[in-house]
Amino acid sequence: MFDVIVIGGGHAGVEASAAAARMGKKTLLLTTLIEQIGAASCNPAIGGLAKGHLVKELDAMGGLMGEITDEAGIQFRILNESKGVAVQGSRAQIDMDKYRIIARNKLLKLPNLEISQEQASVLIVENDEVKGVKTNLENTYFAKKVILTTGTFLNGLIHVGENKLQAGRVGELASVNLGNYLQTLGLKMGRLKTGTCPRVDAKSIDFSVLEIQDGDVNPKAFSFRSKNFNPTQLPCYIARTNTTTHEIIKNNFYRAPLFTGQIEGVGPRYCPSIEDKINRFSDKESHHLFIEPQTIDATEYYINGFSTSLPYEVQIQMLRSVKGFEDAKITRFGYAIEYDYIEPTELKHTLELKKIKNLYCAGQINGTTGYEEAAAQGFMAGINASLSIDMKEPLILRRDEAYIGVLIDDLVVKGTKEPYRMFTSRAEFRLLLREENAILRLGKYGYDLGLLSEQDFTYIQNIANNLQKGLEFLLSKEFTPNNQNNAFLESLGEDKISSIVNLQKIVARASFDIEKLKKLDPMFETMDNYSLREILNEAKYYHYISMQKAQVEKMKNLSELKIPENFDFKSVSGLSNEVVEKLNHHKPPTIFAASQISGITPAALDILQIYIKMQKKKA
């Protein structure tokens, strides 16, 4: 008897099984190929805009993705560095082979975790409660909780031109039996589609005509736990399609599964195939292609931006029309893949299914796309399954606390009909949710769960104390426009002042940096750079942050008004049938969650709020 069974060893499965095992739960990970645990099926990169936030948040609570990325990374960059800190994003190119080896070894070394190379075929469900799993090897395993992290494997169908192949990934069997079984449970399900790009033999690329894209000179680690971070970095390159490339693609639209009706699943809006781009943006004469090394040996390159399901011979023809790729040899062809997913409105915020007790879902099965989105969900599913076994309150992150909270709330409340990916624009309180303050926002959760060490948490507390002291000093210290103070400002290269201001207003200037901050008071000279960066950020955006915090307080009032789990919305007089139907379907846990449901009017919220408050007074 296991406490937790995790089905699938991708990024969601890695985090789910690791979290459960590290929280002391006897855990079993079932995966089709142990060699492919933590495999990066698509591009060789972790992070990016908003995705980097997810990785930092995972790391802040004790997740694995940040540490593995730092160990396997071969190029590190901060995207949007010229823009505000709220929308900057960390991104790393990874050695794909090294990444999965590290992930696999981390799991194999964990106490409480067993791994078995088997494919789950059927779930054991009794009275709408999952009890265990049967596998293709006819083994039966019982567990208190089961977490589905099946990725693209549920009835996975690969498309290349007119050819179709049942697979979860090239060379790996699709999960047909489990996919068909889930259809019998009365869950709302659908089909989605994603795709991948060709990989090219490095020897066949003329790099001399490509634009070089180097990593940052002073790269920053993803994990706050990474020590002596000094990675070997490789360049990426930029190529461009041209009108010849576009003509080749247009002339073969009739062979594209995307346009022939062969593919039924909805693809990712923000990561379209090259044929979709040429069709949708027919006026553009060129599209960027990012040429990314797959490993530190750089023997193969991933052609990012060239995702396609066109026939093999067309892929060769269109790639060779690109400058620098005239003699290109494709080692692995691009393809599209369709797969089953469960509509995420079927889930609670804990990622447990509403209809099947003790059954959790994470990753692409919930309609998301991306390694980082999957890892975040897997981590939270592993935590909440473990907390439920211990009969403890679940960990549900609010939208103002974490991008992970935004991700899960969007899925559960709004649902999705297309592959969902995270953007900074999805977060209402993004100034509060910066990458660098993730440890300050979420570190205590990781520590309380036993996923962060005492040493890690002490480090976080020191930064929090420095931030509090530094900000209080800047807000309380007045600067008068006398000769001495103005001479000091001039020595820093700053403009003089003509009226009394506090130091926060001076530090908020765009030209004010860490070196200048250190000269304001000896206290700052003793602080580490992490603390100083956060003091600087908080000072620069102080008024905007204060406004967002005021908005959060309003939201918290609605979030704290909980709706009983089995609440009958029909019992509330004054609600329309449409509103009752939507509320009964979504089963929002709070008034705030109800406010996020499309079609729920302010008047309906007022009625519901008054009714629940009255019921609580009676109780």
Curated annotation (Swiss-Prot):
SMART domains: GIDA_assoc_3. One of its GO terms (molecular function) is flavin adenine dinucleotide binding. NAD(+) binds at residues 267-281. FAD binds at G8, G9, G10, H11, A12, G13. PROSITE patterns: GIDA_1, GIDA_2. GO terms for cellular component: cytosol. Its cofactor is FAD. InterPro entries: FAD/NAD-bd_sf (IPR036188), GIDA_C_N (IPR049312), MnmG (IPR004416), MnmG-rel (IPR002218), MnmG-rel_CS (IPR020595), MnmG_C (IPR026904), MnmG_C_subdom (IPR047001), MnmG_C_subdom_sf (IPR044920). GO terms for biological process: tRNA methylation; tRNA wobble uridine modification. Keywords: Cytoplasm, FAD, Flavoprotein, NAD, tRNA processing. It holds the Pfam family SAM_GIDA_C. It comes from the Bacteria. The keyword Cytoplasm applies. It is found in: Cytoplasm. Belongs to the MnmG family. NCBIfam families: mnmG_gidA. NAD-binding protein involved in the addition of a carboxymethylaminomethyl (cmnm) group at the wobble position (U34) of certain tRNAs, forming tRNA-cmnm(5)s(2)U34. Homodimer. Heterotetramer of two MnmE and two MnmG subunits. This is tRNA uridine 5-carboxymethylaminomethyl modification enzyme MnmG. It comes from Campylobacter jejuni subsp. jejuni serotype O:6 (strain 81116 / NCTC 11828). The lineage of its organism: Bacteria, Pseudomonadati, Campylobacterota, Epsilonproteobacteria, Campylobacterales.
